[in-house]
Amino acid sequence: MSATAVNTTTQLPVGTWTLDPTHSSAGFAVRHMGVGTFRGRFEQFDAKLTVAEDGTADFLGTVRADSIVVKDENLRAHLLSPDFFDTERYPELSFSSRSLRHDADELVLDGELTIKDHTHTVEARGTLTGPAETLGGVVKVGVELEAVIDRTEFGLNWNAPLPGGGIALGNEVTLTVELELARAAEPEA
């Protein structure tokens, strides 16, 4: 059995890169009752990375808030309600960045995260792997990013006191994306 080497880099290859949703994920984690970590994910999201010849890059990611997946339907309904995402009024979350930089071996995106009607600057850190060519000739890169936010800054304020003290949910939420992005085909001249 042989291992295949994967190039890990902070250099962004020039081009327009679009999401391969089959091989990508978007999720979150938050402390629950001070004793565990609750995790959820989103099923519908998109991302696009455009890298210019001069090395500047734009990133845009969007998430359908009502595509949230958790293991309990009552909890899911609560997360869709005005107590949390209020998906009838705010169907989409978004992150956009025009500031990509490198910090040692990490890729850093400084961008604007919008949840509900709240927009704040957020730093997302992670890795860029590839490029690699698929068996079908498509060139891909992998982008894994993590950002930590205070959910109350985005209007996600619901909480409940626990009988023995403390609160049901932590305010700090870790957002994660693991993306495979495919380079768009060059237009024929």
Which residues are covered by each model-predicted region?
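Low-complexity, acidic/polar, glycine-enriched regions of mature
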Residues: 1-189
